[in-house]
């Protein structure tokens, strides 16, 4: 059986991991074995949190809309139900921005959803 010479393959693989680990503290950024563990964990966290971010922002928007709706005498569910009945199609992100940036406009939307 012929001898297999790997050349630069192993070094390239290790350097790729160390490049990804740049900026990590201590040996986590310089030693291959610990850097490899940290990089794998970091990539797992990034994958998980890309999905979690969508949930977190939706919760934040709902909390903001609820607070602004209660200032106008409505609960969140009544407010959203009123928007559906009035056929006002504004998504939660835009409603939350209105509540924070332009409360007068949000009040107008709330009045329309009441009627």
Curated annotation (Swiss-Prot):
Gene for this chain: rplT
Gene Ontology cellular component annotations, sorted alphabetically: ribonucleoprotein complex; ribosome
GO biological process entries: ribosomal large subunit assembly; translation
Membrane-spanning intervals of the chain: none
The family this protein is said to belong to: Belongs to the bacterial ribosomal protein bL20 family.
Single GO MF descriptor: rRNA binding
A Pfam cross-reference name: Ribosomal_L20
Biological role stated in the UniProt entry: Binds directly to 23S ribosomal RNA and is necessary for the in vitro assembly process of the 50S ribosomal subunit. It is not involved in the protein synthesizing functions of that subunit.
PROSITE patterns reported in the protein's UniProt record: RIBOSOMAL_L20 (PS00937)
Designated name of the protein: Large ribosomal subunit protein bL20
InterPro entries from the UniProt entry: Ribosomal_bL20, RIBOSOMAL_L20_CS, Ribosomal_protein_bL20_C
Highest taxon listed in the record's lineage: Bacteria
Keywords: Ribonucleoprotein, Ribosomal protein, RNA-binding, rRNA-binding
């Amino acid at each position: 059986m012929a001898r297999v010479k790997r050349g630069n393959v192993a070094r390239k693989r290790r350097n790729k991991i160390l490049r990804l680990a740049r900026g990590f503290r201590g040996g986590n950024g310089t030693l291959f074995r610990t850097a490899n563990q940290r990089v794998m964990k970091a990539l797992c966290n990034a994958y998980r949190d890309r999905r979690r971010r969508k949930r977190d922002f939706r919760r934040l928007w709902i909390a903001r809309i609820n607070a602004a709706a209660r200032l106008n005498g409505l609960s969140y569910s009544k407010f959203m139900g009123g928007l559906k009945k009035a056929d006002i199609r504004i998504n939660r992100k835009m409603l939350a921005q209105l509540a924070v940036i332009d409360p007068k406009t949000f009040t107008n939307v709330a009045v329309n959803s009441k009627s």
